[in-house]
């Protein structure tokens, strides 16, 4: 295993040699329909079989991530909301002007009634 440091990579790669066929060798074994295979692809006696030696090539493998880190447990941060009934007291003011059936001008102040109403808000 060889370490590859490249100015264009943000982190080093470790190269591992592997046997990979060249594209020319791969194309050599593909047979198209309605064609006669080349002599190199036909069955030959075992004494005359040609097996090219595969070239070694290098594959870039990224380094393993640090597995020593402690996993942070997930915590449910969404609290359950329960509805509560909150009684509220509101003051309602009714202003009523009293009109009498007469021709006299009424100069009295209008009557004001204040009632307390209790409602429940959910």
Curated annotation (Swiss-Prot):
Record-listed Phosphothreonine modification sites: 98
InterPro entries according to UniProt: Casein_kappa
Alphabetically ordered keywords of this record: Glycoprotein, Milk protein, Phosphoprotein, Secreted
Record GO biological process: lactation; protein stabilization
Glycosylated residues, chain numbering: 74, 84, 86, 89, 95, 102, 118
Recorded superkingdom: Eukaryota
Family classification: Belongs to the kappa-casein family.
Official protein name in the record: Kappa-casein
Annotated organism of origin: Mazama americana
Protein encoded by which gene: CSN3
């Amino acid at each position: 295993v060889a370490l590859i440091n490249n100015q264009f990579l943000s982190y080093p790669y470790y190269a591992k040699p592997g046997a990979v066929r060249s594209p020319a060798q791969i194309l050599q074994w593909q047979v198209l329909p309605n064609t006669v295979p080349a002599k190199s692809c036909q069955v030959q006696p075992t004494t005359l079989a040609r097996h090219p030696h595969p070239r070694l090539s290098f594959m870039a493998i990224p380094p393993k991530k640090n597995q020593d880190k402690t996993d942070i447990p997930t915590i449910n941060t969404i609290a359950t909301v329960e509805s509560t009934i909150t009684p509220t007291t509101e003051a309602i003011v009714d202003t009523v002007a009293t009109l009498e059936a007469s021709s006299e001008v009424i100069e009295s102040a209008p009557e004001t009634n204040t009632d307390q109403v209790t409602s429940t808000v959910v």
